[in-house]
């Protein structure tokens, strides 16, 4: 396990680089036979790792020494030298390169902000994958707020400091990063370029945008969730007031110019009685909207997944996932929760009587199976990542896989479960501080643990969609706007 702490690091290494084509065996690749950096860089230097971070002080230079191998020239911050003392401010980076002939290997050390969350890393993640995370949520503890993109070594290669708690950060074309704020005070998703500048906002025509989900369709529209208050509802059968406001769950699709093209609401489709298990929470803890209206959150929509003409919707407080025919609005099937005529029969699931408990992050895979993060909330069991095969002809949901982590005992909220291209899983364990990757059989492969914080989701992104060069350039641009350090 590795923890980022200021200290002295002295590492003896041998770095090899290769160019295109084949080279004669007698030609030695550029190498560094020794490196020292003060304060400590994370992770330890390795020729295969090109991005590092350091906790630095602008008044105290980062001191670097690099010893080249035979026939190689070291370059520190672009200058041919073996030692340097470089002053860095937050977000700034220094490069260390080694050159032999036309072959160069470059490495990048970037200064973390002093308030960037602490984290530890175990193992190595799936190659070719980034992880977008928002490690800022905590239970009663004030913290700085960041959207961050980590590489397979658990190194934050890009980050953006936000004014409020970011939630549901996701990659959009550009590349850009979109996120909402928690609680949903902004009533919009902000879209930021990698240099931090605001590229736009996604808003709901109704104003009460939810902060749980944003999807982009193939034609460029945006699909998201909306808080939909329904007033003057008699809630006395459920232990509530005779004249209450129910917070219905609503899905909206808008164009990039915010024109509404489709919507669907739980109102008229999902009965309040489907939330019976959650009544103590619903009635005991009303939700106050940004305009001050007190409401009762019977449904708590938290995830949407698009599957051609079908939309999957997760409602936390019915313990159910609903398949909605986009053309008719009809519920085609339901997985979990209070039985209804649309309910699927669950097959092969040891928790089949209650397959879902406050679940999050339903996703449809290319093969038609679905994955979901089952929080197991208030069911006396640990959370899990689950995959089901849905058969509409037999009206069944057959469990194919489940992933658990013995280090994670409970989950009260949040979480995500994504299958990677190689069949591994990446899981954010809800209200727990762990983001992990697991083999298909559940074997732990990689883990990031945030110090007392958790990320609403962990979103894997293929490197084919986002390059390290783009992330570094974005960070360099943000650093230049703040306070360039004297070199």
Task: Show the residue positions of the predicted features.
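Secretory targeting and sorting signals
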Residues: 2-25
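Acidic/proline-rich low-complexity IDRs
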Residues: 3, 7-8, 31, 87, ...
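Compositionally biased, intrinsically disordered low-complexity segments
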Residues: 14-16, 38-40, 485
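Intrinsically disordered/low-complexity terminal segments and short unstructured peptides
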Residues: 19, 35-39, 81-82, 327, ...
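Intrinsically disordered, low-complexity, compositionally biased regions/tails
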Residues: 20-25, 38, 43, 47-50, ...
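Beta-rich interaction/scaffold domains
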Residues: 24-119
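Histidine-/acidic-rich catalytic cores in large beta-rich domains
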Residues: 110-487
